[in-house]
Amino acid sequence: MSNDRTVRDGFLATVEQQIASGDPPEVRATRDRLCATGLSPGEAAQMIAIVLRNEMKQMIAESRSFDNARFAQLLEKLPALP
């Protein structure tokens, strides 16, 4: 398995855990909203994982802590991807 796929799978697993736990609540709400537009739960989770991965990259590049408010704002923009 390639490193990129391993990383992608890790972010997807994180999103699935967040959906199951409801923490943060914006992740489950975004999944539900995307599914209401016709996406499958898997497709919605993949889109959320892309946003999470991009936000984590930005966090590292800027040497800052995770910003949940910023993450929530990015989720609101889905299905448009960053």
Spell out what each predicted region is.
Residues M1-P82:
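Structure-specific DNA junction-binding interface
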